[in-house]
Each structure stands twice: as structure tokens, then as C-alpha cells.
């Protein structure tokens, strides 16, 4: 079953945060996606992935 995860992408203090809703089976698949996004976009400094229960979350940053 696909769970709903919210990705918060922080590009820095001056630019507002961007929220994306994604569906995945496991949070680890989204962590890999977040790491790829960090490599491709130098403006992104932190990506927070919040799970549907708010108990499972992961932060990917440089």
C-alpha cells in the first residue's frame, strides 16, 4: 500500500519552502530521490521527508 509523504524542500532563507506530496511504499525510496535532487540543484540546502503518522521522518541535507 502506498503511503503519503510530504517533502519540504528548503532552498535557503530568502526563498520560501516548497512542499511536494508524494506516494511511496517505503521512506527509503524517497531518501534516494531527495539525495539525487540535492546533487542536481545547488540551491537546495535541506529536504525533510515527513511520513503520514509524523513519527517517521528523514532529513537529507548538505
Each model region followed by its residue ranges:
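Ordered hydrophobic segments in well-structured contexts
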Residues: 4-8, 21, 46-48
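Short, mixed-charge low-complexity intrinsically disordered segments
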Residues: 39-62
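A short, exposed loop/beta-hairpin motif centered on an aromatic-Gly-Thr core
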Residues: 15-29
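Generic alpha-helical structural signal
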Residues: 11, 28-29, 51
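A short, charged, amphipathic alpha-helix used as a generic interaction element across diverse proteins
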Residues: 25-46
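Short aromatic-glycine-(Arg/Gly/Cys) micro-motifs in beta-strand/loop hairpins
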Residues: 1-17
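Generic alpha-helical hydrophobic packing signal
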Residues: 4, 25, 30-31, 55-56, ...
Amino acid at each position: 500500500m502506498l503511503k503519503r509523504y510530504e517533502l519540504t524542500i528548503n532552498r535557503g532563507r530568502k526563498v520560501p519552502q516548497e512542499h511536494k506530496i508524494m506516494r511511496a511504499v517505503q521512506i527509503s525510496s524517497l531518501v534516494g530521490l531527495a539525495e539525487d535532487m540535492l546533487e542536481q540543484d545547488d540551491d537546495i540546502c535541506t529536504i525533510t521527508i515527513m511520513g503520514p503518522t509524523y513519527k517517521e521522518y528523514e532529513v537529507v541535507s548538505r
